[in-house]
């Protein structure tokens, strides 16, 4: 399903802070073990991505290390991580987002603290809506469900890791290759948000002064041969 690299690779995500142009790097801790390790390594390549890239440099490097398609936004992470071949897949990730006039900010999933019971309750309510559009849904863990179906074919998705780094524009969210597909996905996302808005799980969370799950993030879409 993937081709292993010829030699071992060590990838250290988020090792460099994303700072405004001209800003000075803050002081770093000593990290003697990491410094010793780096002394035995050599950089294999430099990745430079545009600010509006739907993936982070780490994700592109990781895709290459696994022998996966490395075009930002087009790496089939869901299919790869779930071990599914021959059908379009994606992750649906329960999240809390805030929609601004021009951009979208996402709360880190860890701050939601969604447990298995609540996640499965949300999935059970969401599943019939997806089934109506020919999509199948499978629970894998509280913060990630696997969705499969033709409606996902050819999607380009902004990764959640990228969105957590800084706000993204609405145009950077999941993009469909055809207008009909795009309309279907927007309708489905709207229906899902309305369902979540009145869901008992969210009613309970709001009583407990916890962030509600108000959206499902689509990411890692693609197909493995």
Where are these regions (language model features)?
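An N-terminal, globular interaction/scaffold subdomain
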Residues: 22-120, 125
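Glycine-rich, mobile lid/loop segments that gate access to catalytic sites or pores
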Residues: 141-156
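Loop-centered beta-sheet repeat module
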Residues: 2, 152-224
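Beta-sheet entry/capping signal
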Residues: 7-9, 136, 144
């Amino acid at each position: 399903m993937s081709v292993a690299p010829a030699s071992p690779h060590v990838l250290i995500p988020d090792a460099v802070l994303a700072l405004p142009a001209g800003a000075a790097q803050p002081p770093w801790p000593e990290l003697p073990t990491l410094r010793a390790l780096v002394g035995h390594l050599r950089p294999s390549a430099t990745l430079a991505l545009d600010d509006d890239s739907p993936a982070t440099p780490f994700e592109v490097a990781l895709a290459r290390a696994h022998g996966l398609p490395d075009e930002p936004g087009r790496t089939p992470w869901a299919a790869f991580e779930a071990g599914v071949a021959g059908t379009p897949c994606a992750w649906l990730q329960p999240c809390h987002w805030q929609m601004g006039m021009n951009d979208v900010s996402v709360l880190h999933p860890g701050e939601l603290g969604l447990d298995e019971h609540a996640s499965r309750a949300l999935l059970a309510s969401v599943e019939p809506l997806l089934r109506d559009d020919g999509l199948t849904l499978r629970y894998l863990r509280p913060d990630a469900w696997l969705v499969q179906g033709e409606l996902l074919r050819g999607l380009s998705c902004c990764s959640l890791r990228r969105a957590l780094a800084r706000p993204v524009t609405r145009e950077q969210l999941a993009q469909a290759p055809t207008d009909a597909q795009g309309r279907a996905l927007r309708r489905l996302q709207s229906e899902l948000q309305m369902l979540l808005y009145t869901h008992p799980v969210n009613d309970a969370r709001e009583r407990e002064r916890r962030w509600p799950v108000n959206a499902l993030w689509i990411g890692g879409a693609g197909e493995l041969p």
